[in-house]
UniProtKB/Swiss-Prot annotation:
Keyword Metal-binding found: yes
Enzyme class: hydrolase
Organism: Aeropyrum pernix (strain ATCC 700893 / DSM 11879 / JCM 9820 / NBRC 100138 / K1)
SUPFAM superfamilies per the UniProt record, alphabetical: Inorganic pyrophosphatase (SSF50324)
Oligomeric and partner information: Homohexamer.
Keyword Metal-binding set for record: yes
Subcellular localization(s) per the UniProt record: Cytoplasm
Protein name: Inorganic pyrophosphatase
GO BP of this protein: phosphate-containing compound metabolic process
């Protein structure tokens, strides 16, 4: 959970959500938010010669079934510093699983007032195939050289499913 944070998922959630960025785009360092120390720490350096294609973080005030907040990949044109908060609009879900089980990611874009470039992305079909391929390729391969780790991407789902995942995770957090 994210008990040290005094912010939640956002007043407009699940349509617009707060995302705490852990990993900036173009980074090969995997950062994670340390809930005890309330700081972003280095988790590991990627073993592959790859970088995160976009900014990556989580929605505070949410709880997935695996005990972690909802993961979010924010499609954007600039890196956002670790620990920063960005308001984002969920547009899709990337379904995947790894060595620990299901590990889907919500895919979002910055709120239009922050960056209008992606305002036309409302649903999974609005994301260009080239971007979806880039995202899928990254998640399929970024753990390849790590012993005992693997990832399999199983598909894409629409914005409505992303919002339902967020809605359930907010309720789960409130009940915890």
């Amino acid at each position: 959970m994210t008990g040290c944070l005094k912010i939640g998922p956002g007043d407009e959630a699940p349509d617009v959500v707060n995302v705490v960025i852990e990993i900036p785009m173009n980074s090969s360092v995997k950062y994670e938010f340390d809930k005890e120390a309330c700081i972003v720490k280095v988790d590991r350096f990627l073993y592959t010669s790859m970088v995160y294609p976009f900014n990556y973080g989580f929605i505070p005030g949410t709880l997935e079934e695996d005990g972690d907040p909802v993961d979010v990949l924010v499609i954007s044109r600039e890196p956002v510093a670790p620990g920063s908060l960005i308001e984002a609009v969920p547009v899709a879900v990337l379904d995947m699983e790894d060595e620990e089980g299901p590990d889907s990611k919500v895919v979002a874009v910055p709120k239009a007032k922050l960056d209008p470039l992606f305002a036309s992305y409302k649903d999974v079909g609005d994301i260009p195939d080239a971007l979806k391929s880039k995202i899928k390729h990254f998640f399929e391969h970024y753990k390849e050289l790590e012993p005992g780790k693997w990832v399999r991407v199983t598909g894409w789902r629409p914005a409505a499913d992303a919002k339902e995942i967020i809605r359930r995770a907010i309720e789960r957090y409130k009940g915890a």
